[in-house]
Amino acid sequence: MKTTINQVYKHTGEEVMIGAWVANKRSSGKIAFLQLRDGTGFIQGVVVKAEVEEDIFQIAKSVTQETSLYVKGIVKEDERSPLGYELAVTSIEVIHEATDYPITPKEHGTEFLMDHRHLWLRSKRQHAIMKIRNEIIRATYEFFNKEGFVKVDPPILTGSAPEGTTELFATKYFDEDAFLSQSGQLYMEAAAMALGKVFSFGPTFRAEKSKTKRHLIEFWMIEPEMAFVEFEENLEVQENYVAYIVQSVLEHCKIELNTLGRDTSKLEQIKAPFPRITYDKAIEFLKEKGFDDIEWGDDFGAPHETAIAESYDKPVFITHYPTSLKPFYMQPAKDRDDVVLCADLIAPEGYGEIIGGSERVHDMDLLEERLKEHGLDSDAYKWYAELRQYGSVPHSGFGLGLERTVAWISGAPHVRETIPFPRLLNRLYP
């Protein structure tokens, strides 16, 4: 019976065949232990000299790391195994012998591992992080489908920058200038006026010359937009969504979280509603904590966000930022025009902002005024402004950065471990 490692529980006491790679091995005179992996998981294969042919035992003793095999064996329950099972090996067929595999069980430096990222992905830790990433993506689609959202794919090549920044990757679009997308938000707003509630999931590109553990040059975002939804309801969608994906990871990635040594008690507390603090109150709090480098009108840096997050055991919304700090498309508060109806969701444990969202400007005159204030070319945004000309309604949305979210939930120390092939300031290889 051919099966995969994650399905062996269905075959207790039976002989199965698994296609696998040797992640590690150890042996004594009469027994060999093979740590096998097949992409679905890891299992220990036990080869007892007295119970197999001599040539099979010799293969087990001499097999090299990452050699590919077909292994047959009896599935046995084993409480000591994270999987709960082991394989009593009866035969081994070598598919391809690996020689001089560069990533050995010893410690390696970060640059070495990044140069060999195409191989580092095979390690138990990286495998666990990728499985958690996959579960977050799966749960994202499940959540938004259940909530009646329509998946929409905005363009990656654009003729304008959604936030009017200079941190763009420029390219030529035949005879025109074009840019790699920083966000699909403006297009998602258009889609929301057609379909009501929409979301996108795709790559974004920001030419930020940053080397922090929170930043990537290419990263993936989930960007929902909702017609007839105002600020508070937008926050409720965000907290319900984040709580949903955390609980899904807890349910479906127990082995992976255990592999990573993640303290799941901290994740078990992540349930809606999340606490809220206004920007004004956050400034007061930071000053009380001794941060003399921050004044009203300044943006928060990583130390400020971490200090605020440490006061809560859940993600916290920082709301109502100064208008001057935020992009042109954010709706001003009803009672004061110096702040906007926006929120950043700050993850616990020092992982920083994972969501930025706001109610969007829905008045055409105000939008045109904001474009002028930000020095943006109104012609480039003509189509976007027209959304306010034909049945404009209050609408809101947000963007969640996938890699930061994966880092927080998995406990990864750096976002470079949360995407298969990270693009960093000085890294475009492999």
Curated annotation (Swiss-Prot):
Q: Which GO terms describe its cellular component?
A: cytoplasm
Superkingdom of this protein's organism: Bacteria
Return the broad EC class: ligase
GO MF terms listed in the record are:
asparagine-tRNA ligase activity; ATP binding; catalytic activity, acting on a protein; nucleic acid binding; transferase activity
In which broad location class does this protein mainly occur, judging by the first location in its UniProt entry? cytoplasm
Q: Which PROSITE patterns has this protein been placed in? A: AA_TRNA_LIGASE_II
* InterPro entries referenced in this protein's UniProt entry, alphabetically: Aa-tRNA-synt_II (IPR004364), aa-tRNA-synth_II (IPR006195), aa-tRNA-synth_II/BPL/LPL (IPR045864), Asn-tRNA-ligase (IPR004522), Asp/Asn-tRNA-synth_IIb (IPR002312), NA-bd_OB-fold (IPR012340), NA-bd_OB_tRNA (IPR004365)
Tell me the disulfide pairings in this chain.
Answer: none
The chemistry this enzyme catalyses reads: tRNA(Asn) + L-asparagine + ATP = L-asparaginyl-tRNA(Asn) + AMP + diphosphate + H(+)
Print the keywords alphabetically.
Answer: Aminoacyl-tRNA synthetase, ATP-binding, Cytoplasm, Ligase, Nucleotide-binding, Protein biosynthesis
Enzyme Commission number(s) from the entry: 6.1.1.22
List the NCBIfam families hit by this protein, alphabetically: asnS (TIGR00457), PRK03932.1 (NF003037), PRK05159.1 (NF003483)
Membership in a protein family? Belongs to the class-II aminoacyl-tRNA synthetase family.
Q: What is this protein called?
A: Asparagine--tRNA ligase
Q: What is the lineage of its organism?
A: Bacteria, Bacillati, Bacillota, Bacilli, Bacillales
What gene makes this protein?
A: asnS
